[in-house]
């Protein structure tokens, strides 16, 4: 949840002087370090070149000069996939064994017992390519998949995306293929990080990276999502 405008104003006002600040989330109440938060806000103002200007968060003033302009989101092309019917290569079948051998040759970082434990899913792409999905590693509370782009004859690996993602699919509205990874920082699930990529007709290309900050047992799913890379997806 986000702070309301009124809560944000109260927080910023409290940071301009010595204050005792507490946040209540459900039945949990946490103390916020006024000095630590004020230092973080001051650093934000400094980085954005807002110190001593009317738009500064904490150290406001009447100086008038240009502030740091936000960067333009990079545009990432994505291609809509018409045939979105997946197929399964079953354990023990000849085609399964052939594709598994190709995947192993292209990347040897997966756990053999896990790689051999499940069927391989094939996602159609465009330009006579497909995406293969196999289990790479399965831990106590999360798993990682092995993804690779192959030709539609399943004879050659053209791109490896191993150990980065654990979900694949198609966008419901625009039909482009994506891979997504979301991983817990530890078992409680109170801190996460992740990334996304989309098919642009040639390769899967990164579209986002994010994290939820530090690990705090009170926030299942993470306290908030903090993007470290964002983009504008343009579907063709």
Predicted features, each with a name:
Residues 1, 133, 137-163:
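Mid-length scaffold segments of soluble, non-membrane domains
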Residues 1-102, 210-235:
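Internal interaction segment
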Residues 120-139:
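Exposed beta-strand-loop-beta-strand "reactive/processing" segments of non-cytosolic proteins
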